[in-house]
């Protein structure tokens, strides 16, 4: 699974780690994140991420 980076703040979403602080389990692909998921650092939507 690919990592995705936030274009605004540089946060990297790593599917192997997920985002447990926001209810996203490890092993969750970026494409499978809920539509309302936002960057945990700066709050932008998934549209502001690109594959690394």
UniProtKB/Swiss-Prot annotation:
Give the top-rank taxon of the lineage listed in the UniProt record for this protein.
Answer: Bacteria
For this UniProt entry, the molecular function terms from Gene Ontology, in alphabetical order, are: electron transfer activity; iron ion binding
Any GO BP: alkane catabolic process
Annotated positions of the N-formylmethionine modification: 1
SUPFAM superfamilies attached to this UniProt entry: Rubredoxin-like
Q: Which Pfam families match?
A: Rubredoxin
Give the InterPro entries listed for this entry: Rubredoxin, Rubredoxin-like_dom, Rubredoxin_dom, Rubredoxin_ET, Rubredoxin_Fe_BS
Cofactor(s), names only, from the UniProt record = Fe(3+)
Rubredoxin-like domain spans which residues?
1-52
Q: Which UniProt keywords apply?
A: Electron transport, Formylation, Iron, Metal-binding, Transport
What does the Swiss-Prot or TrEMBL cofactor note state?
Binds 1 Fe(3+) ion per subunit.
The record lists Fe cation as bound by 6, 9, 39, 42
Signal peptide extent: none
CDD domains per UniProt: rubredoxin
Q: What does this protein do?
A: Rubredoxin is a small nonheme, iron protein lacking acid-labile sulfide. Its single Fe, chelated to 4 Cys, functions as an electron acceptor and may also stabilize the conformation of the molecule.
The record's similarity note reads: Belongs to the rubredoxin family.
The record's listing under PANTHER family reads: RUBREDOXIN, RUBREDOXIN-1-RELATED
NCBIfam families documented for this protein: RubredRD (NF045768)
**This protein's name:** Rubredoxin
- Species, as recorded: Heliobacterium mobile
Q: What is the lineage of its organism?
A: Bacteria, Bacillati, Bacillota, Clostridia, Eubacteriales
């Amino acid at each position: 699974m690919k990592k995705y980076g936030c274009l605004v703040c540089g946060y990297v979403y790593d599917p192997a780690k997920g985002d447990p602080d926001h209810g996203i389990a490890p092993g969750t692909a970026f494409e499978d994140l809920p539509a309302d998921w936002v960057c945990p650092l700066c709050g932008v939507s998934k549209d502001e991420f690109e594959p690394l």
